[in-house]
């Protein structure tokens, strides 16, 4: 029985999921090579995790925020679908962002922060196991070093919002396997995410652990259980899930905030702060515009703003003046001097 036939003929209920006895997936003739073949492939993220033990990734949503992430010394960054939906569309994370929009942003973000690897949020991958191949290849072409791929039903929502639904586990495992095939030998780190925890207060955590372990067998590099409720759940995830583990730190979300060292102790490897920059910049923008509206001037707000010189340094203005001078005439451009 093929993988896609198994998906069509297998009905899994989130509240009664039993992935330890999942014959349709395990009998698949590809199963032998689906057991996380990337264990032998050293991507940039594999190396970062092995070198640092734990990697802290702030979120970014455009070229400028990515440049700031790099210049402030972080070793990696993350393009948040939530943040991009807000900044690009002015809309909530409600399934409105498309894969081509994420890929286009990934291209500008990676160009703006070329010295650090960037993971992109692929959401549900733009469709089924076939659609995900284009999504992954587009992100690789854009320069991304990895992506998150989640098992929500479309239209998806932010992982910390109510009303989420998930697709059958084996269907998402097939999408992970398809993504792995699309990656091939590319330097690309695949994170499998499950949102099933929020669908059942009684069995959601157990189902989540079973799901991400299945997704690891299908070819993921790391597992991501979204929205654990407390430290006990975090510790269970750290103990019982396979491979590298991702933890999402959202200010105001349902998961308690922790430092990287605290999460490392619980068994995590990649710590994402996807909305920190977005929330901070939003508050700063609201504050300065209120000041301008009320006072008609920003002269009493200058200490809370970047200066003209600071901002020009951030976007590397001096290097552009140097290029302008170099190409001002042919002799300079060719590096020749008058004899």
From Swiss-Prot:
It comes from the Eukaryota. It is found in: Plastid, Chloroplast. Keywords: Chloroplast, Plastid, Transferase, Transit peptide. Its main location: plastid. CDD domains: ICL_PEPM (cd00377). It catalyses: 1-carboxyvinyl carboxyphosphonate + H(+) = 3-(hydrohydroxyphosphoryl)pyruvate + CO2. Residues 1-30 form a transit peptide. Pfam families: PEP_mutase. GO terms for molecular function: carboxyvinyl-carboxyphosphonate phosphorylmutase activity; oxo-acid-lyase activity. InterPro entries: ICL/PEPM, Isocitrate_lyase_ph_CS, Pyrv/PenolPyrv_kinase-like_dom, Pyrv_kinase-like_dom_sf. Its EC number is 2.7.8.23. GO terms for cellular component: chloroplast; chloroplast stroma. Transmembrane segments: none annotated. It is an enzyme of class 2 (transferase). PANTHER family: CARBOXYVINYL-CARBOXYPHOSPHONATE PHOSPHORYLMUTASE, CHLOROPLASTIC, PHOSPHOENOLPYRUVATE CARBOXYLASE. Belongs to the isocitrate lyase/PEP mutase superfamily. This is Carboxyvinyl-carboxyphosphonate phosphorylmutase, chloroplastic. It comes from Arabidopsis thaliana.
């Amino acid at each position: 029985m093929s993988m896609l036939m198994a998906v069509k003929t297998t009905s899994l209920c989130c509240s009664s999921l039993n992935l330890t006895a999942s014959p349709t997936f395990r009998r698949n003739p590809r199963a032998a090579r689906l057991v996380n073949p990337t264990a032998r492939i050293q991507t940039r993220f594999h190396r970062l995790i092995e070198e640092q033990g734990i990697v802290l990734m702030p979120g970014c949503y455009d070229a400028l925020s990515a440049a700031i992430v790099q210049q402030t010394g972080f070793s990696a960054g993350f393009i948040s679908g939530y943040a991009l939906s807000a900044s690009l569309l002015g809309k909530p994370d409600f399934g409105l962002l498309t894969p081509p929009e994420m890929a286009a942003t990934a291209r500008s973000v990676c160009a703006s922060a070329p010295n650090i690897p960037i993971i992109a949020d692929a959401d549900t991958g733009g469709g089924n196991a076939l659609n995900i191949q284009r999504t992954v290849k587009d992100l690789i072409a854009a320069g991304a070093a990895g992506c998150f791929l989640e098992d929500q039903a479309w239209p998806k929502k932010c992982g910390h919002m109510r009303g989420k639904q998930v697709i059958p586990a084996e269907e998402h495992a097939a999408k992970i396997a398809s993504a792995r095939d699309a990656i091939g030998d590319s330097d690309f780190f695949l994170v499998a995410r499950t949102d099933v925890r929020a669908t059942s207060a009684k069995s959601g955590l157990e189902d989540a652990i079973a799901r991400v372990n299945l997704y690891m067998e299908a070819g993921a590099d790391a597992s991501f259980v979204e929205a654990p409720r407390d430290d006990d759940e975090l510790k269970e995830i750290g103990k019982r899930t396979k491979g590298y583990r991702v933890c999402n730190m959202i200010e105001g979300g349902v998961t308690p905030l922790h430092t990287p060292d605290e999460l490392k102790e619980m068994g995590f490897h990649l710590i994402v702060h996807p909305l920190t920059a977005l929330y901070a910049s939003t508050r700063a923008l609201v504050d300065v515009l209120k000041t301008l509206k009320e006072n008609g001037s920003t002269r009493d707000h200058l200490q809370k703003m970047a200066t003209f010189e600071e901002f020009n340094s951030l976007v590397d203005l001096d290097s552009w003046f140097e290029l302008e001078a170099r190409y001002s005439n042919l002799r300079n451009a060719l590096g020749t001097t008058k004899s």
